[in-house]
């Protein structure tokens, strides 16, 4: 066997292992939050980025073995940004045989008219996009809207709200849309961004850049993202533990009196959630909860090749 064949087999082995992990993560999230039910028609929001490509690929894969029957329709919103490569997504989706719809709405002009030059346009753009996607879901008869946010996005949102909004509020894996008509799901909620990056590189997805509009990045989100990546590098397992904490909330040991009846505590009341542990030395596990050591091959650096738009 040649060296090239050996490398190819090794790469395929690592890809298969990575895909199994992503499948397991997505399948677990779907089960935990009852994201997909019998007969669902899932509208998969496809932006052309690594996350939405991965979401579509894993959902297509799960379709073949899921205990329930569901259908997929991929939807991309062409917002008429200058230089947007209109041919990329149709060609890719047709090659897969996936049902799809390209929705053309010139929100770019609206945003440029309303937002001063050099300011972040993402907030207004996302509101406009959300309304169009809700309308499209109704037109397509979709029962669920699938978005490509992953675990790291959820943690970023938690810290953004803590640091800048004064709230313990993250990004739910499943919710009712703000128009009260659609169920929104995030199948990648348990998936790590670095796994998605590796998978995207290995699969060779035709990535479309997200900054065609020329908008400046959200500085706060960028700072939080850099902080989390630094923690993940310096303290392996920290992100896993923080995400586990989001699923293990103890309201009686926080300070929100709307979530727990502190006023109702009197002499003779029952001990709740272990009472006061402030004076005890807590048993802290040697390894962070949820952490698993990575294989050397899994930890290889990656670089996403983005299509050059001319």
Swiss-Prot record:
Binds 1 [4Fe-4S] cluster per subunit. The cluster is chelated by three Cys residues, the fourth Fe has a free coordination site that may bind a sulfur atom transferred from the persulfide of IscS. It catalyses: cytidine(32) in tRNA + S-sulfanyl-L-cysteinyl-[cysteine desulfurase] + AH2 + ATP = 2-thiocytidine(32) in tRNA + L-cysteinyl-[cysteine desulfurase] + A + AMP + diphosphate + H(+). Transmembrane segments: none annotated. GO terms for cellular component: cytoplasm. It is found in: Cytoplasm. Disulfide bonds: none annotated. [4Fe-4S] cluster binds at residues 122, 125, 213. Its cofactor is Mg(2+); [4Fe-4S] cluster. Homodimer. The thiolation reaction likely consists of two steps: a first activation step by ATP to form an adenylated intermediate of the target base of tRNA, and a second nucleophilic substitution step of the sulfur (S) atom supplied by the hydrosulfide attached to the Fe-S cluster. Catalyzes the ATP-dependent 2-thiolation of cytidine in position 32 of tRNA, to form 2-thiocytidine (s(2)C32). The sulfur atoms are provided by the cysteine/cysteine desulfurase (IscS) system. Belongs to the TtcA family. This is tRNA-cytidine(32) 2-sulfurtransferase. It comes from Serratia proteamaculans (strain 568). The lineage of its organism: Bacteria, Pseudomonadati, Pseudomonadota, Gammaproteobacteria, Enterobacterales. The gene is ttcA.
């Amino acid at each position: 066997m040649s060296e090239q064949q050996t490398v190819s087999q090794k790469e395929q082995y690592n890809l298969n292992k990575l895909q199994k992990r992503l499948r397991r993560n997505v399948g677990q999230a779907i089960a935990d939050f009852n994201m997909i039910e019998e007969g669902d028609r899932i509208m998969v929001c496809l932006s052309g980025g690594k996350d939405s490509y991965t979401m579509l690929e894993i959902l297509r894969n799960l379709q073949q073995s899921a205990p329930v029957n569901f259908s997929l329709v991929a939807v991309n919103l062409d917002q008429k940004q200058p230089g947007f490569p209109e041919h990329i997504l149709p060609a890719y989706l047709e090659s897969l045989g996936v049902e799809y719809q390209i929705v053309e709405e010139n929100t770019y002009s609206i945003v440029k008219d309303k937002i001063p030059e050099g300011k972040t346009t993402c907030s207004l753009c996302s509101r406009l996009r959300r309304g169009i996607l809700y309308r499209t879901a109704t037109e397509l008869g979709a029962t669920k809207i699938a978005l490509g946010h992953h675990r790291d996005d959820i943690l970023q949102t938690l810290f953004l709200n803590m640091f800048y909004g004064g709230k313990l509020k993250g990004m739910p894996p499943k919710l009712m849309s703000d128009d009260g008509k659609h169920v929104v799901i995030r199948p990648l909620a348990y998936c790590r961004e670095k796994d998605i990056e590796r998978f995207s590189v290995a699969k060779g997805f035709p990535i479309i850049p997200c900054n065609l509009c020329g908008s400046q990045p959200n500085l706060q989100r960028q700072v939080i993202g850099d902080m989390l990546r630094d923690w993940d590098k310096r303290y392996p397992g920290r992100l896993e533990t923080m995400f586990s904490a989001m699923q293990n909330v103890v309201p009686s040991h926080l300070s929100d009196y709307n979530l727990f009846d502190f006023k109702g505590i009197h002499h003779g009341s029952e001990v709740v959630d272990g009472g006061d542990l402030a004076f005890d030395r807590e048993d802290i596990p040697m390894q962070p909860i949820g952490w698993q050591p990575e294989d050397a091959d899994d930890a290889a650096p990656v670089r996403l090749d983005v299509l050059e738009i001319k």
